[in-house]
């Protein structure tokens, strides 16, 4: 239990930050799922368009350090490879 005023304030801030960061992580997962769904549907043009939109979300969340930049790069790389593999 936080006993000092500073500790109580930091506890409040941590709750708010956790809620905000959770919503951003959810946006990341939703963006990745949207691309995966388009890939599974077999529509390469739609998948490529959704991928472009999801890149913005992924990069934005990595810039805010919600996820590590390497994790963001890995997501983008794997999604891009999956889209390219659709033609083959």
Swiss-Prot record:
Q: Could you tell me the superkingdom of the organism this chain comes from?
A: Bacteria
- What does the entry list under GO cellular component? cytosol; small ribosomal subunit
**InterPro entries per the record?**
Ribosomal_bS20 (IPR002583), Ribosomal_bS20_sf (IPR036510)
- The record's region (Disordered) falls at 1-23
Keywords, in A-Z order: Ribonucleoprotein, Ribosomal protein, RNA-binding, rRNA-binding
Asked if the record carries the keyword Ribonucleoprotein, the reply is yes
Tell me one Pfam family matched here.
Ribosomal_S20p
Q: Would you indicate the residue range of the signal peptide?
A: none
Name this protein carries in UniProt: Small ribosomal subunit protein bS20
Which organism does this record belong to?
A: Cupriavidus metallidurans (strain ATCC 43123 / DSM 2839 / NBRC 102507 / CH34)
Q: Which gene encodes it?
A: rpsT
